[in-house]
Amino acid sequence: MPCLKLLFLFVFSLFCLTAANAADKPNVIFILADDLGYGDLSHAGGKARTPHCDRLARQGMRFTDAHTTSSVCTPTRYGIVTGRYNWRSTLKKGVLWGLSEPLVAADRLTTPKFLQQNGYRTGVVGKWHLGLGWQMLPNGEKRLAKTGPTKGDGWQIDYGKKVTGGPLAIGFDESFIIPAAHPPSYDTARSRS
């Protein structure tokens, strides 16, 4: 019986230490909403009621002085994920489309990799817009070469094969994304490490 009490005390202590360590690290939730202005949320004077966002703003940290060199989808996401100016990427203007190749190199230190190195689990949900490594059907490359990634229709993709070069390749533990918000592919991609 004393061994059982000692074991219980050890397990309980271990649990308390683990819980204390987890509490030392704050949760990080980063919300990037396209076409959402600073004053659109109700906590900032907006007319729309946004109680959950308001609560996050009250209980967390808000950054209210941000600047960008390109306020469209891909460059903004590239800057947030890599911490680099968007013009340092291979995309010098515009946005990536649903069939575009990955923009962020897998060997680059990214925000999610940095967070992982500091004990966080990371995930991304929503519009990806940073390119994916789709596997093509036979003759799919020829068809895509004709239409280009901006007009690709998704028929050339082999949906039975693994998608590479996405969120997991640059440090996210989990993802549930759509490749882009405009013409195909509208398919969702869910993955876990």
Label the model's feature ranges.
Residues 5-16:
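Bacterial N-terminal signal peptides
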Residues 5, 20-193:
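Formylglycine-dependent sulfatase
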Residues 1-2:
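N-terminal hydrophobic targeting signals that begin at the initiator methionine
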